């Protein structure tokens, strides 16, 4: 962290925080989270309904021959339950955004109170890591069901785990750093931890986005049944790519903020937290909601696993 001010001059905020903006974001995230949750539950319930020749939710012994011939003998069938669990991190990420902006609204009324400041600072920092976890897991399932695991930049056996591991490390570093930032003696260490966490997040996300483009470019060559399925997978991948780019932009701006330090331009202007943090994270959740109407992981898995030889 560069050019820290002396402890006597240090304040929690370098500006007067807007209570109205924090309340507005709280409401927007509540509405978005409710719609997102209902949408995921609805999609999962639709996929759970028994359908003719749909092995996505039928016993293995009834669909084994179809799956083996269409998807390969070593294919591990995906279930609605295991797929549904991939959405849980993003849900809690949205909850963190809600609680974070509630705490920010409270903090705006008392800018000397440390507790609400720490809550909003930490939760708004680490929430994107939970978004990323959902994106990583959904992408891994998409590659699996389309038999494109060979397109993973890292070993297909550890592909999803590799990205999630980086996400967890980033999450822990930012959480620890966010707590230390609230103290005069710990703010330099806290800033360094957050910077390290953001760098890790950006590096892993960068590799992941490259992997998404690689998949988009090579899927027609690798997927054995590419010409026999609709474009629902394409809309799902587009959803993941757009969300990833939004989070990447947000993380880059936050990284610059902490590299600049306490006396930097970004940290002293509140609109950055809304334009380059709140808006991208809100849009990322909205992209999931809108994208599900055109193609979601449940419809993609159902379609791929329903193929007949």
Curated annotation (Swiss-Prot):
Keywords: Membrane, Transmembrane, Transmembrane helix
GO CC annotations, alphabetized: membrane
Transmembrane stretches, start-end: 22-42, 83-103, 119-139, 162-182, 193-213, 233-253, 278-298
InterPro entries listed in its UniProt record: RTA1
Membrane topology (UniProt): Multi-pass membrane protein
Source organism superkingdom: Eukaryota
Protein family: Belongs to the lipid-translocating exporter (LTE) (TC 9.A.26.1) family.
Known role: Confers resistance to molasses (to a particular toxic element present in some molasses).
Protein name per the record: Protein RTM1
Native source species: Saccharomyces cerevisiae
